[in-house]
């Protein structure tokens, strides 16, 4: 056999072995009400399989998942597999009325997808109303058999995933419905949580504080997920440094720090060497609150890391870390700007679509509404927008279904603006009231398959400037740069990191600042881009990209599954 024939045979054998190694997992996720006790009172919440947080899914790169969602709850629901690329499988992405109609009580739907070319920590959550306050869990993707993590130090073991969340003393769905009805801001959460437990600093909570046994001298892998609805979080472990090795299931150059920042939706993997005197150490998390004058949950959640020493009496003092001030933007910026991709970026040499998106909060005037519907400042209703378009979900069918059937009429329009309709000093202290009111609409921006897309995300100071965690479904993207103030194409383009920018699926657009992302539109379908502060997506801070099919089956959206829910 010639060398060329041998090479082809070996390549085919390698491909077959790769396919053989991949597995398919089947899980049933039953949505149902479960009674739990937090902050001294019992409450009925929505859960998956009665678990809070929900089940952890553990797979290897290349594996496929079939999740049979059975809705035995009282609300419509969908599930989103946050950060999963969903190549050609947009029907399984999950945001209600964007890629599917919701699964109604008594109905079911099977999500089917393969997790390819992704390793690390992702997660899943409800994508209907505010159900994700209690319907969420981890998705852990390990390297295939025969490969290892590309870390400078291999961990002795992995600890259980650390899911950070928020807790309300009332039904979160009632919280958002009341706010939608009145036009006012929703109630803030009553507690922050680690693995659904508030921790020692809250009433009636110390007995169930999240607990992590560790062994002196070991280096462990810790996986953090910010599943909170509306709160960005500073996180620190007393007495220990953490070396960041991945973010949003993309590997990073090792970065050692005592402080993490996670926006809602983001994940961070770290290595920690437990080399301190035997004892107990608090992991603590509290808010990074970047908006001036806006109420926020100012409590602190804790978990305990325990060396298990024989002389470690339970009454001994537990070391507490020092966390930054709530509004410490300098600390937040220092963390995000120190992240670098592990390898040289595969950036496109050209940009086909250069977009400029303003993101921010605004207000609707209340000319034809009652006083009870106008609970915002000065008799208004809160709103939010991208490029002055406040996103409205359809109700008769999903955007993806309407697109697939060639019937967008009455569902969406393909005229989302590539730039804001009015240019102004986006981060000025006194933005004109004439710019405060967005226009409601269900608009998408069309992209050709394979086009290279660059988006400048510009924060605005309309009403109140704030750090906005912007999440893009169906894609990872490179973060080329971020900065404060208004983006200046002439000066700021020179700051782009074209060598090793971090790759993520959720980027924090700095308060009164900007971030620039770039990706290739190689995944056909309809893909939501939105602020992952749920209060803001509720107000309309979202848009969607419609990516056309390419050439042939492998560049085209799969056919809709037969059990796709009806509206």
From Swiss-Prot:
Protein name: Laccase-23
Record EC number: 1.10.3.2
Binding residues for Cu cation 1: 80, 471
Compartments reported by the entry: Secreted, Extracellular space, Apoplast
Catalysed conversion reaction: 4 hydroquinone + O2 = 4 benzosemiquinone + 2 H2O
Pfam families hit by this protein: Cu-oxidase, Cu-oxidase_2, Cu-oxidase_3
Record function comment: Lignin degradation and detoxification of lignin-derived products.
Glycosylated residues (UniProt): 76, 187, 241, 298, 312, 327, 365, 368, 378, 388, 430
Superkingdom of origin: Eukaryota
PANTHER family in the record: LACCASE-17-RELATED, MULTI-COPPER OXIDASE
Entry's Gene Ontology BP terms: lignin catabolic process
CDD domains: CuRO_1_LCC_plant, CuRO_2_LCC_plant, CuRO_3_LCC_plant
NCBIfam families: laccase
Record carries keyword Repeat: yes
Gene Ontology molecular function terms on file: copper ion binding; hydroquinone:oxygen oxidoreductase activity; oxidoreductase activity
Any single Gene Ontology cellular-component annotation: apoplast
Binding site for Cu cation 4: 468, 531, 536
Binding site for Cu cation 2: 82, 125, 532
């Amino acid at each position: 056999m010639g060398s060329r024939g041998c090479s082809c045979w070996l390549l085919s054998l390698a491909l077959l072995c790769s396919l053989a190694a991949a597995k398919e997992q089947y899980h049933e996720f039953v949505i149902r009400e479960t009674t739990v006790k937090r902050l001294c009172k019992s409450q009925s919440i929505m859960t998956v399989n009665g678990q809070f947080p929900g089940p952890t899914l553990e797979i290897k790169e290349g594996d496929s998942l079939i999740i049979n969602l059975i809705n035995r709850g009282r609300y419509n629901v969908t599930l989103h597999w946050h950060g999963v690329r969903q190549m050609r499988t947009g029907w399984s992405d999950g945001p209600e009325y964007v890629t599917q109609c919701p699964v109604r009580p008594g109905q079911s739907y099977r999500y089917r997808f393969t997790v390819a070319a992704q390793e690390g920590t992702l997660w899943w959550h409800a994508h209907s109303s505010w159900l994700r306050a209690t319907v969420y869990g981890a998705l852990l993707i390990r390297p295939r058999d025969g490969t290892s993590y590309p870390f400078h130090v291999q961990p002795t073991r992995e600890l259980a995933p650390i899911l950070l969340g928020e807790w309300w003393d009332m039904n979160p769905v009632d919280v958002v419905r009341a706010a939608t009805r009145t036009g006012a801001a929703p109630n803030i959460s009553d507690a922050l949580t680690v693995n659904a437990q508030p921790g020692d600093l809250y009433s009636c909570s110390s007995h169930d504080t999240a607990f992590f046994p560790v062994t002196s001298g070991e280096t462990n892998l810790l996986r953090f997920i910010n599943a909170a609805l509306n709160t960005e979080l500073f996180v620190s472990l007393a007495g220990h440094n953490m070396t960041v090795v991945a973010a949003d299931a993309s590997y990073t150059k090792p970065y050692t720090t005592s402080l993490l920042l996670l926006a809602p939706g983001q994940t961070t993997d770290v290595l920690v060497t437990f080399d301190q005197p035997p004892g107990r150490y608090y992991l603590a998390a509290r808010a990074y609150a970047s908006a001036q004058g806006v109420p926020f949950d100012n409590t602190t959640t804790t978990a305990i890391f325990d060396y298990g020493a024989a002389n470690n009496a339970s009454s001994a003092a537990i070391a507490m870390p020092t966390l930054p001030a709530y509004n410490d933007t300098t600390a937040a910026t220092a963390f995000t700007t120190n992240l670098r991709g592990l390898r040289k970026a595969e950036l496109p040499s050209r940009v086909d679509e250069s977009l400029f998106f303003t993101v921010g909060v605004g207000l609707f005037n209340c000319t034809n509404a009652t006083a009870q519907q106008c609970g915002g400042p000065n008799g208004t209703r809160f709103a939010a927008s991208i490029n002055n378009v406040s996103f409205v979900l359809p109700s008769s069918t999903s955007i993806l279904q309407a697109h697939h059937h060639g019937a967008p009429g009455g569902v969406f329009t393909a005229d989302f603006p590539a730039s804001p309709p009015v240019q102004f000093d986006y981060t000025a202290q006194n933005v004109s009231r004439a710019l405060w009111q967005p226009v409601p609409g269900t608009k998408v921006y069309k992209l050709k398959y394979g086009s290279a897309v660059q988006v400048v995300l510009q924060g605005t100071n309309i009403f109140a400037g704030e750090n906005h965690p912007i999440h893009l479904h169906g894609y990872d993207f490179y973060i080329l740069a971020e900065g404060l103030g208004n983006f200046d194409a002439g000066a700021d383009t020179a700051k782009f990191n074209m060598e090793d920018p971090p790759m993520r699926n959720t980027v924090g657009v700095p308060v009164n600042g900007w971030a620039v992302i770039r990706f290739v539109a190689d995944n056909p379908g309809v893909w939501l881009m939105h602020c992952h502060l749920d209060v803001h997506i509720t107000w309309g801070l979202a848009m969607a990209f419609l990516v056309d099919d390419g050439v042939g089956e492998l560049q085209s959206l799969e056919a809709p599954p037969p059990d796709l829910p009806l509206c």
